[in-house]
């Protein structure tokens, strides 16, 4: 009887990463060998082309080894949707999500997997950016964002935790059942629950190119998360509506009072 080995799926979305394709394919190959040796697991690699305008998909297909597939999206939907597309294809006992820009190292990836393997009571191990390289202003803005978004919820979104994480297959299945059109993965990962553990890390520098996240993209992303996972905007809108209604009622009472008791002719409806 053939004994089935546990399996690990690696989901890696990419956008215009042709320059780093060969290096990332090598990293995945090294990771596959290390995972097989240390944990006795088979590895299947799922790369998601998020509408790249370069030949990254071709370069990946030429450089990848072992078991792999490339999911090609019809346009650039954004990383959040690309991650979902990869999770939709995953069938492994565990699923590792990592970036294709080489900022997520082999060493940290193995540590994440080891934590999950060694702790059967844990369902998710996520990498938490220690922000050593971030400016003081950016760190303070991030802290303010998380304090606001977590101030009115029954669950907390971990600070500085992104998509870089490993999870059990059951968690991946639960996440794929959440079909939000406007996705904010940080919030969805936390909302889904399960037993989660943080692993601090410092991301590597990009191997080539620049970040695809502009300041405007970051602001839009933050607003998406804030409006999706905080009741503060709804309460502010409700309060502003209440104040506007109260102001209108007071003004209407003032107009009627002047017409009835002082005979002041106000042009318009009270005359």
Where are these regions (language model features)?
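Residues in soluble alpha-helical coiled-coils and helical-bundle/repeat scaffolds
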Residues: 15-19, 103, 107, 176, ...
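A ubiquitous structural signal for well-ordered alpha-helices
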Residues: 24-27, 31, 112, 144, ...
